[in-house]
Structure formats: C-alpha cells, structure tokens
Amino acid sequence: MAVVDLFDLPREGVLLGIDPGTATIGVAATDRIRMMASPVETILKKKLAPSLERLLHIYDERAAVGLIVGLPLNVDGSMGPRAQSVRTLVSSLLKVRDLPVTFQDERYSSAEAGDIMRAAGATRRNREARIDASAAAVILQDALSRLERRP
C-alpha cells in the first residue's frame, strides 16, 4: 500500500499514530469510530527490528487499518535530517509489512502534549514517561480534525 494521502486511508476503523523520536516511538490509537485519539505506549528504540515488531504487534492487536506518522518538519516547512530519519524508518517498516501510511506535520506536537499533561495535573516524572505517546495522540487528533473537514 505504501505512503498514501490522508484522505485515501480507509474511512472506517482504528488508526494508529506514531511520534518517532531518536530514542523512542510514541504510539497512540483512535477508538473504532474515530472520535478521539489516546496515548497507547512509548516504545524504546534500542534496535530497529524489535521496535518495528512491537509497533506491528500493537497495530494488529488494535486491528488498525492505517498508520499516521508524525513528520518533524522544520519551522519553515522544509525537511531536515530528523524528517529524513522518519522517512527512513517508514521505509524500513514498509519493507516488513505493506500497510497504508500517511505523514502528518508534527511541529509543536510535543510542546502541545506537555501543555495538555500539565493542565491535567500530571507530575513532571509522569509527563517525561508519557510525553512521546501523548505527542502521538496530538498528531493523531490533528489528523482526525483534518479528516472531519474531508472534501
């Protein structure tokens, strides 16, 4: 299936969102009716193969129909080394399993996730442990908002 446009993802079913970082991959999922996105877990990215295996396990466990990947664009919208690293990760994932993947601009998602967690009263330690999964939920919720405005 490879990389597709957001509007080409299946119209129904669970979507998984990820916030790929240098040391971790934050994972979030929608509910079946795509009303909201929730943090699922943070995968430690020590080695690529086990990280991708865990991600695909979550994908299967949740019966997901598509993957939304946060793309860390530069402030001006251009692609830098971090964005290229994410594209390489997705390429590696697609070599393991052919599934529908789309990219979502993730600028400021970690800051927004931190603000949400602070407002909810999360301790600093809790925020640090869950920030990547929470950022994945922000990325996924942004994609859901875009899907609501589907032409």
Curated annotation (Swiss-Prot):
EC assignment: 3.1.-.-
Gene3D superfamilies: YqgF/RNase H-like domain
SMART domains in the record: YqgFc
Keyword Nucleus in record: no
Keyword vocabulary terms for this entry: Cytoplasm, Hydrolase, Nuclease, Ribosome biogenesis
Superkingdom, taxonomy of origin: Bacteria
Cellular component terms (Gene Ontology): cytosol
InterPro entries tied to this protein: RNaseH-like_sf, YqgF, YqgF/RNaseH-like_dom, YqgF/RNaseH-like_dom_sf
Location within or outside the cell: Cytoplasm
GO biological process: rRNA 5'-end processing
Coiled-coil features, chain-numbered ranges: none
Alphabetized HAMAP family for the sequence: Nuclease_YqgF (MF_00651)
Matching NCBIfam families: RNAse_H_YqgF
Function: Could be a nuclease involved in processing of the 5'-end of pre-16S rRNA.
Descriptive protein name: Putative pre-16S rRNA nuclease
